[in-house]
């Protein structure tokens, strides 16, 4: 489980001309030419050349595989993570509701609604904007399955227009046990928000997830898409009508996923996703009318996470202007303010804000750094927004001249992709430790991930029951590698100084979370498509492979 504090800062002062294929090639050519700013990894170009090329398609495939390891409920016959089994089959029984399904957020067995919904929102956003890239890599079906496993659960948990089940399990009792999910004996108490105990942040985030997913399924399953949109609209109405933070209503969540940023960002986020899903101007007006009072255009943010949605919603609002949305014209003034804040975040990632304190820190090895606990969640979400915004700029009507407007100098779309790529590469092993922070990728990766199911022998190999204390005695404390590889999991990652200790007890660094991996699905898909495009273009230009001398130059 991850905790975090929002970094809210005072506001600072202040027709397509190319084909898609050409844009892909031009962007990647620029990306390849730009330095990755990994100063501490400066053992030299020779060491870099000796490394094998990174396989973004494999990273994408394993990212989606990870979500199957996090499944709760009755697993399907198509389950590919075979060391897992059915779990949580009586969830909701005490309360008389069916809450079987959904995802475990990290290395334990609580189902927390807020980070689960954010995970699905990010998976859906990536599937909307980069559908062709995911499909080109052959992973579209798995992406849909990952999204649907979450949305099926959200529909179940929304048992009444003004009732939503926020959590199943209890973090305190869960942490006293080290068991496989198939054996768990901890509390499966369920907690809800309703009229008297509101949760606008949770309702808003879940509405955003369902609205985004409704777009994903619009063509392949119109009936299901309509169902998701119906629940999204009801949940938004619930969150807006009965306002309050869910952690004020549910004490048990405060130590794990407290909503530090409040609920205003989730309501704006949900409204913009509903506008994108429906095209109804009423949702856009909501985001415009509440832009100031809800902080949408008042806060300059250097974090995008399961808690703080401002940067994400600001990018969504900016997209309306970049796309030339007809409804945006009447609200251009406010939407320009949203765009300014979106660009403040992106410029902060690039280090292009004049005031250094307004920029995101970097480790010596080039990792974007926000805080010590599970920092890679912030690097992955930043990589996504950089990738998405560069895509919007490249696809806009003024793509030939479009650039990110930063106080320290404009940045082209290719430069944003370059930074996103540097974060992806850092995660995959291009870092000072030469260690992949994606489990199962590459030759070296964390072997002692803080994850109950992965750290205990599979029940399919040894079906004997393992109790709470026995799990700690026999499995948690042992120094050997986990018996099950949690493939595709992105762990919390290294310190500000690029230091990492592979220890099961070091949960700040070795625990993986669903929202670490979710944003990277689209990033890996995009990078795979771009590298494939440039390879194809090079082959088309020189189908015979060129002369030996030219091939030598190409390798350099």
UniProtKB/Swiss-Prot annotation:
Coiled coil: none annotated. It is found in: Secreted. Pfam families: Glyco_hydro_9. Its EC number is 3.2.1.4. It is an enzyme of class 3 (hydrolase). The keyword Transferase does not apply. GO terms for biological process: cell wall organization; cellulose catabolic process. It comes from the Eukaryota. The keyword Lipoprotein does not apply. InterPro entries: 6-hairpin_glycosidase_sf, 6hp_glycosidase-like_sf, Glyco_hydro_9, Glyco_hydro_9_His_AS. The active site is at residues 108, 450, 502, 511. PROSITE patterns: GH9_1, GH9_2. Gene3D superfamilies: 1.50.10.10. GO terms for cellular component: extracellular region. Keywords: Carbohydrate metabolism, Cell wall biogenesis/degradation, Cellulose degradation, Glycosidase, Hydrolase, Polysaccharide degradation, Secreted, Signal. It catalyses: Endohydrolysis of (1->4)-beta-D-glucosidic linkages in cellulose, lichenin and cereal beta-D-glucans. Residues 1-33 form the signal peptide. One of its GO terms (molecular function) is cellulase activity. Its main location: secreted. PANTHER family: ENDO-1,4-BETA-GLUCANASE (PTHR22298). Belongs to the glycosyl hydrolase 9 (cellulase E) family. This is Endoglucanase 22.
């Amino acid at each position: 489980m991850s905790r975090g504090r929002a970094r809210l800062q005072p506001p600072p002062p202040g027709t397509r001309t190319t084909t898609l294929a050409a844009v892909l090639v031009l962007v990647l050519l620029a990306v390849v030419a730009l330095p990755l700013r990994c100063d501490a990894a400066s053992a030299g170009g020779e060491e870099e050349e000796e490394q094998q090329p990174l396989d973004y398609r494999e990273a994408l495939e394993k990212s989606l595989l990870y979500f199957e390891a996090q499944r709760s409920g009755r697993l399907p016959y198509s389950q590919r993570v075979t060391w897992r089994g059915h779990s949580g089959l009586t969830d909701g029984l005490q309360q008389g509701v069916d809450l079987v399904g959904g995802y475990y957020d990290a290395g334990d067995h609580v189902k927390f609604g807020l980070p689960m919904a954010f995970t699905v929102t990010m998976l859906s956003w990536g599937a909307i904007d980069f559908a062709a890239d995911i499909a080109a890599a052959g992973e579209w079906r798995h992406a849909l399955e990952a999204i649907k496993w979450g949305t099926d659960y959200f529909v179940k948990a929304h048992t009444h227009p003004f009732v939503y089940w926020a959590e199943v399990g209890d973090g305190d009792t869960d942490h006293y046990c080290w068991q496989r999910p198939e054996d768990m004996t901890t509390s499966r108490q369920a907690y809800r928000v309703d009229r008297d105990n509101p949760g606008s942040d949770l309702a808003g985030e879940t509405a955003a997830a369902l609205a985004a997913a409704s777009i994903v399924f619009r063509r392949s399953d119109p009936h299901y898409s309509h169902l998701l949109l119906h629940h999204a609209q009801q949940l938004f109405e619930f969150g807006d009508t009965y306002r309050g933070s869910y952690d004020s209503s549910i004490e048990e969540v405060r130590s794990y996923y407290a909503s530090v940023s409040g609920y205003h960002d989730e309501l704006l986020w949900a409204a913009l996703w509903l506008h994108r899903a429906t095209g109804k101007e009423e949702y856009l007006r909501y985001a415009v009318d509440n832009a100031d009072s809800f902080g949408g255009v008042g806060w300059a943010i250097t974090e995008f996470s399961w808690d703080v949605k401002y940067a994400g919603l600001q990018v969504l609002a900016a997209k309306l202007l970049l796309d030339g949305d007809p409804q945006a014209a009447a609200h251009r003034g406010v939407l320009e303010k949203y765009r300014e804040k979106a660009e403040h975040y992106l410029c902060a990632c690039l280090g292009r804000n004049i005031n250094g304190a307004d920029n995101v820190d970097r480790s010596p090895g080039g990792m974007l750094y926000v805080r010590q606990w599970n920092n890679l969640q912030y690097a992955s979400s930043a990589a996504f927004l950089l990738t998405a915004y560069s895509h919007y700029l490249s696809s806009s009507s003024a793509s030939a001249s479009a650039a990110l407007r930063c106080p320290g100098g404009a940045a082209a779309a290719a430069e944003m992709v370059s930074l996103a790529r540097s974060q992806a590469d850092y995660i995959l092993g291009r870092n000072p430790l030469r260690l992949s922070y994606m489990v199962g990728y590459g030759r070296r990766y964390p072997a002692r991930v803080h994850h109950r199911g992965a750290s205990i022998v599979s029940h399919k190999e040894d079906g004997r029951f393992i109790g709470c204390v026995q799990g700690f005695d026999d499995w948690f404390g042992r120094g050997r590698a986990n018996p099950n590889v949690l493939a595709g999991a992105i762990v919390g990652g290294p310190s500000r100084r690029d230091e990492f200790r592979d220890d099961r007890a070091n949960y700040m660094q070795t625990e993986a979370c669903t929202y670490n991996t979710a944003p990277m699905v689209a990033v890996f898909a995009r990078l795979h498509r771009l590298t494939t495009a440039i390879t194809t273009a090079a082959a088309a230009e020189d189908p015979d492979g060129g002369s030996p001398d030219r091939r030598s130059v190409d390798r350099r």
